[in-house]
Amino acid sequence: MGLLLTALLQTAERFSVHLYEKRRDYTRTRMVQVASYLVADSVASYCTDYIDEESVQAVFDPQEITAGLAFRQSIPPDLMARLRGWAQGFCPLNAIERSLSDLIDARQSHPVRRSVAAVTAEDAMAMLAPGDILIDCTGSNSLLRDQLVPGAGAVDGSPNTFKIRLEYALVVTFLYGQAYDCNESCKYYKNIENAHYKFIPAVNRTYYDGSISHVTGIVSITAEDYERMPSRFDGHWLRSHFPHVAESMDRFIAKVKEETNGEIIGDLEIIRIPLDLYRARHATSREWRRTGTGDHPFIRSPVFLVGDSAMGSPYFQSISLGFECAMFLAGLLVQRDLPLPDMLDRYELYAYKQWLRVYMRSKMIKHNKDLLECVGDTVA
């Protein structure tokens, strides 16, 4: 997220951007997808998602969506071309990171200062000078999220984090060597023989080849199963230690192969995770400006949370949500005549509306998933 924000702000004459990265080698290979609404050119094409189309229309005014689309038109062509390419299908995360990093370095007329350092919250506060703007893109374990509430240091827990644990699950990912689609009916019929564990897939093409499909399957597990599993493993380990869980996965794969005569490319990648839905109650340092005392740096300099630092959902990859928040924030920052209090208010409202969208979408996906998991259960 920090790379995208840097690329968005880099060409703005009023900013001198300093990007801090924990590391410069991009090793995260998991497949992600940039949603098509990020490159939409009309309100109609923006509101095309079959799950949250109505939610978007209920939460956001048409004028808000139109303003976001207008900012997209100002995004430099070199960056927009990349976004359109990634929106074609799933892409390795580190390929996106490397592409953005190379783009930043290639813009010789607008150099960015880059530092590799493990920055702490105390470091971030100490380096803030009057006139600086600090943007936290450090992810779900945000560096500054719980520092945005005055007095948070004296409070146990996470005072600025609201979290709902929906369930525990296995997330199974693999590439399949044929174009494939799986709607709700497909998910239903492919799980009829699975008595307990259901394999609920999401399928889409890869961005580089429309004939290769990326499959992400979620299998709900118990808290006891979760504790007995390592954090990451492969299909062989699952079949050896949890054969009943593996059966649901293997049945799905076998039926897909039977229909299309394709094969899995490479290995299965499986992780076990708690599926948490969360948000920051305050997405900026506005509360410090309202109620803070003394000479705290967050009173002098604004702080914003972007991406997973601000909110996250387990059922769909949050890179698109983070990218959209980054675009909205960049659009605010380039407005020279926008007073800082108004900027903070507008970003807080936007973050809350995005949270409503995320919450409703996540609950709908969970509802649909729970219904599919009742397949074959004559008691439910």
Sequence positions of predicted segments:
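N-terminal Rossmann-like FAD-binding beta1-loop-alpha1 element of flavoenzymes
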Residues: 1-20
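Active-site-adjacent segment of FAD-dependent monooxygenases/related oxidoreductases
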Residues: 15-18, 22-109, 362, 366, ...
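C-terminal helical "tail/cap" subdomain of flavin- and related membrane-associated enzymes
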Residues: 43, 316, 331-380
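A conserved short coil-to-beta-strand element within the FAD-binding core of flavoproteins
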Residues: 110-129
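Flavin (primarily FAD) binding-site architecture
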Residues: 134-157, 226-235
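Glycine-rich loop(s) and the adjacent beta-strand/alpha-helix scaffold that form part
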Residues: 148-186
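Conserved FAD/dinucleotide-binding core of flavoprotein oxidoreductases
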Residues: 185-288
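FAD-binding beta-loop-beta segment adjacent to the flavin cofactor pocket
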Residues: 271-316, 338-341
